[in-house]
Amino acid sequence: MKKTSLAILMMAGMMGVSQVNAANVGYIDYGKVQDNYPLAQSAIKEIDSQTLALQQYMVDKEKQYKALDTPLKKQNFETTTTKEFQAKQEALVKLKAQKDELIYNKIQAAAKQVLVEQKLDAVVDYRVIFVGGVDISDLVIQKLKTMN
């Protein structure tokens, strides 16, 4: 009888400990947050604008190329244009990387604030959660809008 009572008490104690250690996990839909974040939208517009400008640059250069009359002029033009295009393309890639990093850092900072406010133990991407967790995407979006 004593052993049975002791076993029941131990199991009850273990159940209590396991419930105390249960983690509160939040998750965000990064795409949704990014789509509803004004800074991200303006960055996308800026990058799209730069991409269109680069495409227009190539169209203009193609017209200039067709107007050249000698093979030497064409070869020199190709060399110059290739260097200019690569420089512009690298600048665009660098701009996109900078904007992506800035947006990611701001979303992460907002998610950290929501984590603290909601007393969560972790925040993960929604694709990692199969069952359970708390969707904090809207809270992160609200936090981002008040941070700016």
Regions found by a protein language model. Give the residues of each.
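Positively charged n-region of N-terminal signal peptides that target proteins for export
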Residues: 1-4
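Bacterial N-terminal signal peptides
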Residues: 8-16
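Sec/Tat signal peptide C-region and signal peptidase I cleavage site
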Residues: 16-22
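Amphipathic, charged alpha-helical segments and their helix-to-coil junctions
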Residues: 23-148
